[in-house]
Amino acid sequence: MTFRNGGRLMRGRGGRRKVCEFSRLGILPDYKDPERLRRFLGPTGKILPRRRTGLTAKMQRRLTIAIKRARHMALLPFVERSVTDRRR
């Protein structure tokens, strides 16, 4: 797909739109399911943004709350171990 941008032709990024995994499965993000929550964490343990996860805004907010609860209950780490090992 090409389109004009200030007189220049730009090639857009093709691809399929991501579908919200939680809406597709009909479930809600739950802090008691750390394996499912880990898929939404980056390699350093940070929560991935919506544009990477493909979640709706509502589900992204619920996911964030579920991840934070799981971290406080020690079901998920705040920081991945590989990051802390590099500093030593």
Swiss-Prot record:
* SUPFAM superfamilies in the cross-refs: Ribosomal protein S18
Q: Which InterPro entries does its entry note? A: Ribosomal_bS18 (IPR001648), Ribosomal_bS18_CS (IPR018275), Ribosomal_bS18_sf (IPR036870)
Species of origin reads Roseiflexus castenholzii (strain DSM 13941 / HLO8)
The family database entries (Gene3D superfamilies) matched by this protein are listed as: Ribosomal protein S18 (4.10.640.10)
- GO terms for CC? cytosolic small ribosomal subunit
> Which family would the database say this protein is a member of?
Belongs to the bacterial ribosomal protein bS18 family.
Superkingdom of the source? Answer: Bacteria
Report the function annotation for this chain.
Binds as a heterodimer with protein bS6 to the central domain of the 16S rRNA, where it helps stabilize the platform of the 30S subunit.
Question: What name is this protein filed under?
Answer: Small ribosomal subunit protein bS18B
Q: How does it assemble?
A: Part of the 30S ribosomal subunit. Forms a tight heterodimer with protein bS6.
Which keywords has UniProt assigned to this entry? Ribonucleoprotein, Ribosomal protein, RNA-binding, rRNA-binding
Provide the GO biological process annotations: translation
Pfam families linked to this entry: Ribosomal_S18
Q: Tell me a Gene Ontology molecular-function term this record carries.
A: small ribosomal subunit rRNA binding
